[in-house]
Amino acid sequence: MFPDSSYLFSMRSLSRFLIAIFGCGALLASCDSFERSVLPFDKTDELVVITVNSPDTYYENAEGSYAGLDYDLATEFAKELGMKVRFKTVPRLDKAWSLLEKHKGHFAAGMNISAKHSRHVAFGPIYQLVQPQLAYNTDYNKPKNLHQLGGRTIRIAKGVTHAEQLNKAKHEVPELKWKEMDLTPDELLARLAEGKVDYVVADSTQINLAKNFYPNLNAAFNLGDSVGRAWAFSPFAEQALLEATQKFFTRIQQDGTLTRLLDRYYGHIERLHHTDVNGILAKRRTILPELREHFYEAEELSGIDWRLIAALAYQESHWDALATSPSNVRGIMMLTEITADRMKVTDRLDARQSILAGARYFALLKDKLPTRIKEPDRTWMALAAYNQGPSHLEDARILAQKMGLSPDAWVDLKKTLPLLSQSEHFRTLRHGFARGGQAVVLAESVRIYYEILQKYEPPYSWGFPIVARKEDDSWQEF
């Protein structure tokens, strides 16, 4: 869950941050001879950000662009300041702390607040709460507490704050053992899934992300209290930078930007059960090879990543070309008769016809959305429209506007789509009742299946859309 705004921006947090501002300013005044590694904030147009290269903060996505919560936050911050942004990526957190201490960047992003580091750095406002947890391999018995580890060694990534929680726990569990490793939490969790280490302590977000790729991973129990995540600044950070940071986080919390970004990266990660993950991983080896060429062709036809089309097909039918619902929705893409006719499908149970038609229809739904709706929200809304139709999606957008929410933000439509099944809402809308909750489930599930396929399946590396839409009647308005 996301942190409560009253916690994130409490007066206590603000007071601590303002103390840090004036403390750092005083320290800077007494350190004129300090040799800087980055230009002063007020003497440069480039913001230098230190961050770890990981799916939790900063990474290269399937399109070859950079993404991640802290990438988006830092980019938005630089844009607000009218500055360029440059990222210094490191493989592990200990390297990030080291670079920060040497003032190699203006701040380090995605850092967990800890008592140890608070003595040496200033932390900005908390923008996310994470829960340290003990992860275990579900092929073995689940420990209920630290006493049940049987003398086995816990692994943690070097530079993380979890050593502080473990040191506290050792007072009650003297036999507790752990080892810091020159690996990222993601790499440690992969080793845990492979049975190469006994236990791993990591943040809840990291474990939940990893569970979608390694279904034999799970959290056994929480370790201590939740921890705030924030940007960390060296003692030599300028007062103007610290004040600008406070102003920025206050703004994005108040206008909903922070909520939307947290939902973009974490709002869907706990949707699937481990059996769902096991299912797609197994069928990826047995069924997907027979369908892969059809999905490649669908990407050429629609311009949509074949792995997204395959994820949608898996959610709809588990890649069963003969799937049929009680309402006569049929085929691998579960097309209605009306949609099949519109897409000129002669046999809905023909896998190739169904996949190509489903991809074209999905692309058409995306094209019909207002151009102001940006990715990735545009894709998630198109998925919802694929499930319940564009008219009901538009009703949900209208309802969002009536409720003071954004009709262009997926995080807000996740709230209004389920309301389409409630009479107090749907009787006020043009298109009436809809099972909008189903659309949310479909879109959120496809998001995870897509991430799984992105991890294990390479992109289709050649070819461009080969069908001219104007020459194909099935691309016309509907």
Curated annotation (Swiss-Prot):
Give its E.C. classification number. 4.2.2.n1
Keyword Glycoprotein among record annotations: no
Entry GO terms, CC: cell outer membrane
Q: Which one GO biological process term can you cite for this protein?
A: peptidoglycan catabolic process
User: Which reaction equations make up its catalytic activity?
Assistant: Exolytic cleavage of the (1->4)-beta-glycosidic linkage between N-acetylmuramic acid (MurNAc) and N-acetylglucosamine (GlcNAc) residues in peptidoglycan, from either the reducing or the non-reducing ends of the peptidoglycan chains, with concomitant formation of a 1,6-anhydrobond in the MurNAc residue
The annotated region (Non-LT domain) lies at 30-269
User: How does the UniProt record describe the way this protein sits in the membrane?
Assistant: Peripheral membrane protein
Where in or outside the cell is it found? Cell outer membrane
User: Which keywords does UniProt give here?
Assistant: Cell outer membrane, Cell wall biogenesis/degradation, Lyase, Membrane, Signal
Q: Where are the transmembrane segments?
A: none
**Keyword presence, ATP-binding:** no
Q: Which SMART domains match?
A: PBPb
Gene3D superfamilies per the UniProt record, alphabetical = 1.10.530.10, Periplasmic binding protein-like II
Q: Which residues form the signal peptide?
A: 1-29
Active site feature? E316
Main subcellular localisation: membrane
Which InterPro entries would you find in this protein's record? Lysozyme-like_dom_sf, MltF, Solute-binding_3/MltF_N, Transglyc_AS, Transglycosylase_SLT_dom_1
Write out the ranges of the annotated region (LT domain): 271-478
Q: Which family does it belong to?
A: In the N-terminal section; belongs to the bacterial solute-binding protein 3 family.
Question: Could you tell me what this protein does?
Answer: Murein-degrading enzyme that degrades murein glycan strands and insoluble, high-molecular weight murein sacculi, with the concomitant formation of a 1,6-anhydromuramoyl product. Lytic transglycosylases (LTs) play an integral role in the metabolism of the peptidoglycan (PG) sacculus. Their lytic action creates space within the PG sacculus to allow for its expansion as well as for the insertion of various structures such as secretion systems and flagella.
NCBIfam families per the record? PRK10859.1
| UniProt note: domains | The N-terminal domain does not have lytic activity and probably modulates enzymatic activity. The C-terminal domain is the catalytic active domain.
What's the protein name? Membrane-bound lytic murein transglycosylase F
Q: What's the encoding gene here?
A: mltF
